[in-house]
Regions:
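Short alpha-helical Gxxx[C/S/T] motif in the catalytic ATP-binding
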Residues: 101, 105
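ATP-lid-like helix-loop hinge signature
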Residues: 36-62
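Conserved micro-motifs of the catalytic ATP-binding
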Residues: 17-20, 93
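Short conserved segment of the HATPase_c
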Residues: 76-89
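Conserved catalytic submotifs in the C-terminal HATPase_c
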Residues: 6-16
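A residue-level detector for a conserved hydrophobic packing site
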Residues: 25-26
Length: 133
């Protein structure tokens, strides 16, 4: 873990419950946060002095749970034309990646009655997951 990255967590409820396979969803969240950390580390190879940050937001309302992970890493630079390609198996931007991580994340989210969206932002990336209750 990179101790120089600020991780900010915001939630609108102390108790958010979802009927799920907790092991599978834990892997989803771990994979997405790990990707954010790696993206920030990759950016820091070229830009030495920036405020490294990951923001995690978890919100619940009557019919859905929304998770948003935002980072200020390199973003989806290789997927500007078609952001959905980020979900294709064996597509990777990492030196040692397999390209399976996000396709597995997508399948797991879909299996849990959810939808994932990858949103390019000016300085980084945003991932939004909505689980229907």
């Amino acid at each position: 873990l990179d101790n120089s990255i600020d991780i900010i967590f915001n939630k609108n409820s102390d108790k958010i419950l979802i009927e799920s396979d907790k092991e599978q969803l834990s892997r989803v969240f771990l994979n997405l946060i790990k990707n954010s950390i790696e993206s920030i580390q990759q950016k820091s190879e070229n830009i030495s002095n920036f405020n490294k940050k990951i923001t995690i937001e978890l919100h619940q309302n009557n019919n859905q749970i929304t998770l948003i992970i935002t980072d200020n890493g390199i973003g989806f630079v290789n997927f500007n034309e078609n952001i959905r390609n980020v979900l294709n198996p064996y597509i990777t931007t990492k030196k040692s990646g397999t390209g399976l991580g996000l396709s597995i994340v997508n399948k797991t989210v879909n299996d849990h009655n959810g939808k994932i969206e990858f949103i390019p932002i000016k300085d980084g990336a945003k991932i939004k997951i909505i689980f229907l209750k």
